[in-house]
Amino acid sequence: MERFRDGAQDAFEDLFARHAPRVQGFLARMVRNGALAEDLLQATFLSVIRSRGRYEPGTRFIPWLMTIAANAARDALRHQRHVDAYASREDTATPASAAPDDSDPSLRRHLLDALQQLHPDHREAVVLSKVEGWSFEEIGALRGISPGAARLRAHRGYEKLRELLGELELEVAR
């Protein structure tokens, strides 16, 4: 990043090639929409280009990059909630709850559905800790909170997942 910040144009290509797969995976798990994740990946790296002058040498690049990606995902999810709320008011013919999709009963799908129902802060902490393997210290540094607060967010996410997946188990048993 320091080479790119100092004006080496080929350095950006190296950064993108090295980090894009990881960032896209993170974004895909956060928004659970491949096309949106791709758009957010592009927006993230566009922000890197625009913000390169604010990058401080010696700063760890991955947390800086993931902060940009996480903020992009949060903004997109916030926007989507507003769109969904508006659409649900406009479309009263659509039933409020659809039947579960019997064609794909896999645990992975149910887990991803449950993840989407978590508060964005909790989902981010769960994904970063359990999927990406980040420590609570790293998550705290990313979000500007204490490691204990990061742990609490993840714990609340785990509890909600247990609740949601338990409800699913009851529905399947009926």
From Swiss-Prot:
- Transmembrane segments annotated in the record for this chain: none
Q: Sorted alphabetically, which InterPro entries does this protein's record hold?
A: RNA_pol_sigma-70-like, RNA_pol_sigma-70_dom, RNA_pol_sigma70_ECF_CS, RNA_pol_sigma70_r2, RNA_pol_sigma70_r4_t2, RNA_pol_sigma_r2, RNA_pol_sigma_r3/r4-like, WH-like_DNA-bd_sf
Which parts of the sequence are annotated with region: Disordered? 86-106
From which residue to which does the signal peptide run?
A: none
Quote the Pfam families the UniProt record gives. Answer: Sigma70_r2, Sigma70_r4_2
Q: What induces it?
A: By light.
**Gene Ontology biological process terms, A to Z:** carotenoid biosynthetic process; DNA-templated transcription initiation
Q: Which residues carry the record's DNA-binding region feature? A: 136-155
Q: Where is this motif: Polymerase core binding?
A: 39-52
Q: Which Gene3D superfamilies match?
A: 1.10.1740.10, Winged helix-like DNA-binding domain superfamily/Winged helix DNA-binding domain
Which GO terms fall under molecular function for this chain's record? DNA binding; sigma factor activity
Q: Which UniProt keywords apply?
A: Carotenoid biosynthesis, DNA-binding, Sigma factor, Transcription, Transcription regulation
Identify the domain of life.
Bacteria
For this protein, the record's NCBIfam families field holds: sigma70-ECF
Protein function: Sigma factors are initiation factors that promote the attachment of RNA polymerase to specific initiation sites and are then released. This sigma factor regulates genes for the light induced biosynthesis of carotenoids.
Q: Which family does it belong to?
A: Belongs to the sigma-70 factor family. ECF subfamily.
Under which name does UniProt file this protein?
A: RNA polymerase sigma factor CarQ
Q: Which lineage is the organism of this entry classified under, starting from the top rank?
A: Bacteria, Pseudomonadati, Myxococcota, Myxococcia, Myxococcales
